[in-house]
């Protein structure tokens, strides 16, 4: 008996931060703030789409760093251990999932896109992710506006 299909959005955190101009600008002076802005955006996206969000930040060049996993609302934030890239974590994670799961990986790294496609996931570029986020926000606003209008009419 197979389990229920799950929908995932896996985000290569620093790759997306460096691809989005507004986050890249913030990261120059405050990397933590840029991470939080990305986390907030993915929380909102995951709430709207129902996807399980996973953001992976690598600690590849940080000495003596242990893997840290943090849960926030409907997403998981992963800080990889020393010498582990976000790419290797993402590849291993995808390999652990069921073939029935729907997995999207957000990265601009072409080599990583090819690897995740080979593992059965789909890829989404930083630009496509940004457009999806903007569309989700627009639909949330529309939904809230129509709900507000219904309340006013009653």
Language model segments and positions:
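Nuclease catalytic cores that cleave nucleic-acid phosphodiester bonds
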Residues: 2-11, 15-154
